[in-house]
Amino acid sequence: AGRAPAPPPEPPLSRERRRIKHILSQLGMAGEKGSQDIIELCIALLQRGQTASQVGVAALCAQLSDNPKTMEQRARRALDRGLNHIASLGVEDYTNEFFTRYSARLFPFQEVRAEMAHLQGKGPGGKANLRTFLDGLLILAEEE
């Protein structure tokens, strides 16, 4: 009686890719066009062992796309959607598990607060920082 053959090895970084997709879906970003760009940016950074702060988002987009400005803009739009979603969770219940887990790790606190205030009709919205978001997402993807 032989044992079942070992499952084939997973492609490199597939665990991290799944984790990133999961986080983006929790942030309400999975359906956005730019979410795939964010995943590509993260995988490229993981492969290089670098952060977005070290490389720069514009430089990384230029290496990955024939149209880097469009790639960066799609990612920023998806990120704005994520900031809006996390702020909505915070307005509803600031003890929400996803809000407490992701808000401070992926977005500057003052920007989340500004977006929450905006949702309540008190001032302009927050501005998400793609570099900060990518760096935080890399850490989260490697954690679990």
Over which residues does each language-model region extend?
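C-terminal output/effector regions of signal-responsive regulators
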Residues: 2-75, 83, 92, 123-127, ...
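Charged/polar positions within long, soluble alpha-helices
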Residues: 50, 80-87, 117
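Charge-biased C-terminal accessory regions appended to nucleic-acid-, cytoskeletal NTPase
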Residues: 87, 91-144
